[in-house]
């Protein structure tokens, strides 16, 4: 992939449309990604209408790109199609459980990432919205998702109208382990995060939030224990309602 070393999240798009032909080709090509037992345990809901984007926006904290992007794609863990196929072929499906959700979520995220790679090769811009699993029930209601279908990722898609700077990444040694997992000593943590913490934009981020360290911004402001626990409870409730937990 020629674009992987320059990829960035794009949140602003031109008014140029993404053609149906191009979108269908990219989604079709993305189907070649890895999938458990060749079952393709995913679906994608394509949203183009202004009304539907307006209804989806609150589930993503009203981030502007949801309504401004030409296309919004919601990728779903989907065991419904496989379950109905089994029932219609005199088979007894047993996919209303946590393992099945995990398998379907993995399939859906692989499909999503492969699609993003292909789209960026075509010059399109994408932004991955992690908010999909924060308030999934709202998305389920808007998209009318049936039992055994759960949204796990959302992508806004369009032709870029910005060229943001590349974001930093940890060094390879921070994430790569040889043969067994090498746990992190304080010294290794210091070394791996030194460059990130020294970036001027991150130092300003700490100052604006009135914190002592960058880590505190993440734990105290952006991804708090209270929010994580509340959204975890909400996600578990959705898995029950959608038939993956009994």
Per-segment meaning from a language model:
Residues 1-246:
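Acidic, surface-exposed loops and disordered segments
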């Amino acid at each position: 992939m020629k674009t992987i070393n320059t990829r960035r999240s794009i949140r602003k798009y031109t008014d140029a449309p993404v053609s149906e032909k191009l979108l269908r080709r990219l989604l079709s090509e993305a189907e070649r990604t890895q999938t458990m037992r060749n079952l393709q345990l995913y679906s994608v809901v394509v949203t183009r209408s202004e009304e539907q984007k307006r209804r989806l926006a609150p589930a993503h904290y009203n981030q502007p790109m949801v309504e401004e992007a030409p296309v919004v794609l919601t990728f779903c863990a989907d065991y419904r199609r496989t379950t109905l196929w089994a029932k219609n072929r005199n088979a007894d499906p047993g996919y209303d459980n946590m393992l099945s959700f995990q398998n379907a979520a993995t399939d859906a995220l692989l499909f999503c990432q492969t699609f993003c790679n292909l789209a960026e090769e075509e010059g399109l811009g994408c932004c991955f919205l992690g908010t999909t699993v924060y308030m999934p029930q709202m998305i389920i209601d808007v998209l009318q998702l049936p039992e055994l279908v759960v949204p796990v990722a959302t992508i806004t898609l369009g032709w870029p109208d910005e060229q943001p700077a590349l974001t930093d990444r940890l060094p390879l040694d921070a994430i790569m382990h040889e043969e067994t997992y090498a746990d992190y000593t304080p010294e290794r943590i210091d070394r791996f995060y030194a460059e990130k913490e020294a970036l001027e934009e991150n130092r300003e981020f700490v100052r604006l939030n009135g914190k002592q360290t960058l880590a505190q911004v993440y734990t105290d402001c952006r991804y708090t224990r209270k929010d994580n626990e509340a959204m975890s409870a909400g996600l578990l409730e959705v898995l029950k309602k959608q038939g993956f937990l009994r």
